């Protein structure tokens, strides 16, 4: 019983804290990936450069910094324009979905993750991301309803107070 109560409070805490199962990336990792891209550009093969760019894209869309996430989205969208093997496109679509999720564009993120699932129905990462997106949309909806209800309640109280004050004056 105590375990169930603990789970309940953990889920409530997670609901209000906004935590999810998608990893974060810090500036040091991004700087390291940028250095790898420079080195691969200077002295590596084209395949090594592509691999380093994918790692950098991953790091950028997993960043806590909005400008990094936007940069990662732009890099991935530009790289999708060139023809690539389906597996590589699937990875890029997934990373784009993460980037759009991180930037708050949940509908675009869900569209992209759905495309990933169409490509591979049992892809666990994509399925977890889809659930995370849906949970976030639900949570935002519940919070929005709460804010709206609170606003209507406040307006009702003010209107009731005015009516009560006017009826006392008569």
Swiss-Prot record:
Pfam families assigned to the protein according to its UniProt record, in alphabetical order: Fis1_TPR_C (PF14853), Fis1_TPR_N (PF14852)
GO annotations of cellular component type: chloroplast; cytosol; mitochondrial outer membrane; mitochondrion; peroxisomal membrane; peroxisome
TPR repeat coordinates: 90-123
Knockout-associated phenotype: Reduced plant growth. Increase in the size of mitochondria and decrease in the number of mitochondria per cell.
Function: Component of the peroxisomal and mitochondrial division machineries. Plays a role in promoting the fission of mitochondria and peroxisomes.
Record comment regarding domains: The C-terminus is necessary for mitochondrial or peroxisomal targeting, while the N-terminus is necessary for mitochondrial or peroxisomal fission.
Subunit structure: Interacts with ARC5.
Protein name, UniProt field: Mitochondrial fission 1 protein A
Organism of provenance: Arabidopsis thaliana (Mouse-ear cress)
Highest classification ranks of the organism: Eukaryota, Viridiplantae, Streptophyta, Embryophyta, Tracheophyta
Gene: FIS1A
